[in-house]
């Protein structure tokens, strides 16, 4: 019951019912309703883009960009292509990073790519992606709870608002750390492969 009831509170060996929903279970409920395509991927794209900032030596950094939108030019330096979460690198047979990188390397949309040696790929670690998505869902759920309490949609008191903000900030820090741990595999094409 403790894990399922929205209005049951527990602290050490004490239990009580309240008219306000338990925030932890509210977060779990909201987490289940987060859309991967509409909410999760845009958040991850934005957060990964922020990690690189503006000071870098690349002609461009393309985060989760389709091959047609990655320019085929020499530019001032190489281009970094950050592969999406569904193209994780693994040392096992489930390695999708190579096939996704090859698609972008070989073609720019429907046309063959001419300057293949100008691309470097950053792939997510296949084993960490599921933890990353889970943490991003937790962050989005806490963020929506804080927004609802502040707007008055969710009836909670000041202590619950502060608890929600602490949980949101903790989830935000964990998400930032996991993003840095996830995108760690650098794939650089070699001359034999490019030919």
Question: For the regions a protein language model found, what residue spans apply to each?
Answer:
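Extended alpha-helical scaffold and adjacent linker segments that couple domains
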Residues: 2-195
């Amino acid at each position: 019951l403790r894990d399922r009831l929205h209005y049951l509170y527990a602290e050490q060996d004490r239990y009580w019912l309240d008219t306000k929903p338990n925030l932890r279970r509210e977060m779990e409920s909201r987490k289940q309703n987060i859309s991967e395509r509409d909410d999760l991927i845009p958040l991850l794209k934005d957060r990964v883009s922020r990690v690189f900032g503006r000071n870098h030596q690349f002609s461009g950094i393309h985060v989760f960009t389709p091959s047609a939108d990655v320019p085929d030019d020499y530019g001032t330096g190489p281009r970094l292509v950050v592969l999406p979460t569904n193209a994780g690198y693994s040392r096992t047979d489930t390695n999708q990073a190579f096939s996704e990188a090859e698609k972008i390397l070989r073609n720019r949309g429907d046309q063959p790519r001419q300057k293949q040696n100008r691309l470097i790929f950053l792939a997510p670690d296949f084993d960490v992606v599921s933890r990353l998505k889970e943490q991003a869902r937790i962050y989005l759920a806490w963020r929506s709870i804080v927004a609802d309490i502040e707007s008055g949609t969710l009836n909670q008191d000041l202590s619950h608002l502060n608890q929600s903000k602490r949980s949101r900030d903790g989830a935000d820090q964990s998400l930032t750390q996991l993003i840095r741990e996830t995108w760690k595999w650098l794939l650089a094409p070699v001359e034999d492969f490019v030919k």
